Regions:
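Short, surface-exposed "cap/lid" segments of acyl-processing enzymes
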Residues: 1-18
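Hydrophobic transmembrane signal anchors and adjacent membrane-proximal interface regions, especially
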Residues: 5-9, 76, 137-139, 156
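Charged/polar, solvent-exposed surface patches and flexible loops
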Residues: 9-13, 41, 157-162
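Short, acidic/turn-prone active-site loops that include or flank metal/cofactor-
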Residues: 26-27, 136
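C-terminal catalytic-base region of ester-bond hydrolases, centering on the histidine
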Residues: 96-166
Length: 166
């Protein structure tokens, strides 16, 4: 358990003078659907925001994907990184099914690791990142990042270095 340390470099990278950056920590021992009202309350409280960009990693990507039909009034980009969107366990224990549509104001990006290099997923007999959702842009991450294996935790740093936050 990295206890969130994998977010330090990415947050330092994307936080700048023109970007207001927030970190939302939630109870990952609970099903993600239970957290949506709390997160929507936080998003709704933001004033004078023209656009929001949400990055969710791993299980946080599941939480982020549940916002596809929730956010209506603000231009939104949702980026899910190394997220087990097709997890049979989440379906079994939480009743989670990935959304089948999204609001028109929402752009959706999936950043997928290479399963055999991702130690969170390489023991699965399927790739839990794979879903059939035509309204998303899918980016397959490379094998290496800064000369090292690009696995589950490094994926956030790679995205922070390569995402366009305009």
């Amino acid at each position: 358990d990295s206890r969130g340390f994998e977010w330090i470099y990415p947050l330092q990278t994307i936080d700048n003078e023109v970007t207001k950056t927030y970190f939302f920590r939630w109870d990952t021992t609970k099903c993600p659907q239970k957290t949506i009202p709390i997160l929507m309350k936080e998003i709704s409280a933001m004033k004078d925001i023209k656009k929001i960009t949400i990055l969710g990693h791993s299980y946080g990507g599941i939480l982020s994907s549940l916002l596809l039909n929730e956010i209506e009034a603000i231009e939104t980009e949702i980026h899910v990184i190394a997220a087990p969107l097709g997890s049979s366990d989440l379906k079994k224990y939480c009743g989670y099914d990935h959304q089948t549509s999204k609001n028109n104001n929402v752009s959706y990006y999936q950043w997928r690791t290479i399963k055999k290099l991702d130690y969170a997923f390489n023991s699965f007999d399927y790739d839990p990142q794979l879903i059939d959702f035509k309204e998303s842009i899918v980016v397959r991450l490379p094998r290496e990042y800064r000369g090292k294996r690009l696995g589950h935790l490094w994926s956030i740093s790679w995205v922070a270095d390569n995402i366009n936050l305009d």
